[in-house]
Amino acid sequence: MSDLSKDELANDAYQALLVMLKSDGKHKLKEEEAPRKRQKRNKVTEKLSVAQEPEEDEENIEDAEQESASEVQELLEAGDHLQEDEVPKENDPFHTHYEAPSTEELASAITKLNNGEIKKENLDCSLGVKQIQQVPSEKLSLRLSSFAPANVSDLKLKQRLLRSYLSIKPSGNMTNLQCELAKHIFNYEDVLFSNVSSKCDTLVRNLYTLHAINHVYKVRDHVLKNSAKLSQNQELEFRDQGYTRPKVLILLPTRNACLQFVETLIQFTGAEQVENRKRFSNEFSIETEVISEKKPEDFRQLFAGNTDDMFRLGIKFTRKTIKLFSQFYNSDIIVASPLGLRMAIGNKSDKKRDFDYLSSIEVAIVDQADALLMQNWEHLEYVFEHMNKLPKNSHGCDFSRVRPWYLEEQSRYLRQTLMFSHYNAVDINAFYLHEMLNLAGRVKFHPKQKGVLNSLGYHITQTFARVQTESLLKVPDARFEHFTSTLVPQLLKNAMGGILVYIPSYFDYVRVRNYFEDEAISYVSICEYTKNSDISRARTQFYQNRKQIMLYTERAHHFRRFDFRGVRGIIMYAPPTNAQFYVELTRMPMRSISDGILDADAAKCRVLYTKYDMIPMEPIVGSERVTNMCKGKHDIYEFV
């Protein structure tokens, strides 16, 4: 025993305490109660009308305790000034969600959820169709069924937040979009909204920023008020905390997105003082904006400002100030890129890893998920894999005040997850199904898509060829077989040249590129890793028709948005993830028509797809066509 260090002894004691707390929910410690024959191909033709490092030490813990004690003293001296915030708990979604359920009711609901016992309901709304999924339970009620806010004053905001917001926007009015989202966001349900346009980015950000601030305010005030009561009567017992202080996690793609969020947060709080604001501005903004006006609007918006995707920031609230760059364990909100947070967590092979600061996240917000998809989706999955876990160390936790559902490892089922994206995608939808497990329910908004086939501005023959495959796992092989056996021979016979082969998946791109190399097929290629000098050479050779085929990846298009000259025809190896990319790609032959190297009626685009491609196909062909095209009896659909 004497060979053990003080830290090792403390850690052993902490682990023993956790076991004891979880082992018997009926016993009390001193101040707590543990609580998934190829058919003949048929053709359908349709004529279209034109139309900070997360480290802590004993000094940080002591500082946090002193600050908390100071805030409690302020509260005691202020008397009953917070009584104006008192709302009956049964009318406040915050209390209904986090305080009402017992661990037994939660355990029963979790079992139903894991067994797939989910009630589904589709409702028409102003944003299209919303699918609401809940675990049926007579006893468990984590949401207010009557919650339907029409104005900011209906959101059950803390009064000081409401006053600050109304000083900026006196009417308090919300748009139809905000009202529809707010009734689920502020009701603590999980939300996936994948139709955020460039015009409503700010509306969505304003809404989730309000929610994040409100949650932090309610958590902190609730804890401080109870601490004030305990200071006067130590016989009282409150279960009102998690293991660590951070309660809200915001995941964003770039430093500029973080800058916009923090500026909105500061504006809405009306904080008297913001510590480290100059440092924040220096590190998260840039002096000169250099983006061509010829680039699409969504591109200019996404890549505005500082586009660095490696950052993390702690934000701490006190009653009168906001501190930026606070240590994670002293922070209320953590704002980070998935890459930045993954680097802080460390790899699984690292001896020293730390992610305890994610143990008590109650609201997780992912904005611009489509941009994160084009970075590295695995980073996002990695972060959520390490969220709401039992902490390895105590970090100064007062276990007598830890909520029972934290001790029972049920917190991920009460965590609210909000995800916003410009479009839906397979990975985004999978995240919704596997990570958004809130027992209060989850809502996915499904917009009615008109499609983009007749919005190209000129005549081009658009052919969609369905590739037959027996299972999802066989899709890559089936697509490659169709491409190499059917389309490549046609390409080699075509003396016209100017064929752009667009490949969404980098792995498919590598496979096709290697096939071209093995078969000695002349081509050029541009992917996200191609050097600028090689890009210039490839574009010149392709335009001059010295190379008749160009391989082009989706991520290269996302980050560069090239408009190639010399394109006469397009083959899409699979449907683009973003329907806007389909529009941009199919418009490329227009330049060849203008340059006189392509007849006006000779432009063609061919898209390979499978029955499993409904998600990317729907915004391209429209909601009315997609089911028949993916599941109908015909394999070829042509739009002229």
UniProtKB/Swiss-Prot annotation:
Functional summary from the UniProt entry: DEAD-box RNA helicase-like protein required for pre-18S rRNA processing, specifically at sites A0, A1, and A2.
Residue stretches of biased makeup (Basic and acidic residues): 24-36
Cystine pairings recorded for this chain: none
A GO molecular function held by the record: rRNA binding
Subcellular location: Nucleus, Nucleolus
GO cellular component, one term: nucleolus
Superkingdom as given in the UniProt entry: Eukaryota
Organism: Schizosaccharomyces japonicus (strain yFS275 / FY16936)
Bias kind Acidic residues: ranges: 53-68
Quaternary structure annotation from Swiss-Prot or TrEMBL: Component of the ribosomal small subunit (SSU) processome composed of at least 40 protein subunits and snoRNA U3.
Name used for this protein in its record: U3 small nucleolar RNA-associated protein 25
Region listing for Disordered, in residue ranges: 24-72
Similarity comment text for this entry: Belongs to the UTP25 family.
GO biological process, one term: maturation of SSU-rRNA from tricistronic rRNA transcript (SSU-rRNA, 5.8S rRNA, LSU-rRNA)
Gene that specifies this protein: utp25
Pfam families: Utp25_C, UTP25_NTPase-like
Keywords: Nucleus, Ribonucleoprotein, Ribosome biogenesis, rRNA processing
